[in-house]
């Protein structure tokens, strides 16, 4: 027993001496930031896929490959190839994705350390990222989507996040999201400030601009709405003496429009301001209700022995309503 205790004491004493003279690195030395100026961390971001862009929730789901590369001379070794160590055993810049909502990391948290002390960390992340959207032009809008990284525990003088020119950042050409088309992307250092009064920390952002493909909304929203509005014009071609038929058609059109509004509600973003699509739907609704009011007016005129005036009003409305609707469509959907 005494020999065992003596052996443990000698081993611990020798280890302390080796650490003190730098023969082996101490754990505390490795997990502290290198003191030789700001640590330059080279970042690579590649968007493997974008699964969904949700305008209503103002977020997007993406599959992202992220790579960090930095140099720590304290980790240099005499081996002939890179060694693998757990990430939490060495110092690392602790970079966070600041606009994540839910994020899953699929690669193990390990690093490869080259003989010269270069550290390489690779990770694949999948999840949801928040993105405030300006939807005034919906659905004819273009949006910029970003993934913002930040070394939140370090100032810009302690850690620098830079674009890695040795590895290509970018975005895949074929994406799962079918109703958007990527136009361009950028990857660049971008300081991160949690609040306007706080000091900026070192940051990096990958952004891509995308245009919404409007084919879905033309087929599912715009064309059906045009047909419903056009159906309301049928009342102008029915003789005012047939007031029952006119009112029946007008009410049927109105109820169809109300049901249609409920059906498309899930496809429209819930924002506090009116989008171009909202203006189109709102003005179309007003025109449908206006046709019902016109039917009531002509029916009243016909019953009051003013049939000629009622027919003249219908003839004017046959042209006025389509022209007004065309102006509404151009102003809200084109200009």
Residue ranges and their predicted role:
Residues 1-6, 324:
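Positively charged n-region of N-terminal signal peptides that target proteins for export
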Residues 204-324:
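Channel- or pocket-lining gating/hinge segments that regulate access to a cavity or pore
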Residues 330-335:
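Juxtamembrane boundary at the C-terminal end of a transmembrane helix
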Residues 8-20:
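Bacterial N-terminal signal peptides
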Residues 24-209:
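Soluble non-transmembrane domains of integral membrane proteins
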Residues 18, 64, 293:
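A residue-level signal for conserved active-site and pocket-lining positions in enzyme catalytic cores
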